[in-house]
Amino acid sequence: AEAETKAKEHHFVRFITAQNEWSLLKREGECDAIPACEQYGLGQLPYFPLASGLLTGKYHRGEAFAAGSRLATLKFFQGWATDENFTKIEALQAFAKKRGHTLLDLAFSWLAAQPCVVSVIAGATTPEQVHANATAANWKLSAAELTEVDALAPRASV
């Protein structure tokens, strides 16, 4: 916010986008960074939209992580595999399945439905993953569906 104010005051080139970690499991940015983007007209480019694979549907509570995956090898990412997150994942997966979609579809479509999101930064290791990521946001969530998703994976509180 301060950089935006200074840029306006001094007629500097303004920021046009911001990158923040943002997903259905990581919503802390909605308390500060996202409202600032909306206030200053900045586009948001969320990264880790699939929470390091947890929102793909391939990981399940109580199962070992795939050998070589981030969740198996890096302690930072293992911290995401909590009972609280798996409870959200299971509810979100059921929500998506009931509507004929995947958890991955929901993760991308939910981000695409956010007003300030201009694109999503997503990684892929196979051509199939690229295709799945590219087509996932085709699901246009209704206002009622967005409200239901918010109840299943609530915003972080300040």
Please place each PLM-identified region on the residue numbering.
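Beta/alpha (TIM)-barrel catalytic core signal, keyed to glycine-rich beta->alpha loops juxtaposed to Asp/Glu
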Residues: 1-151, 156
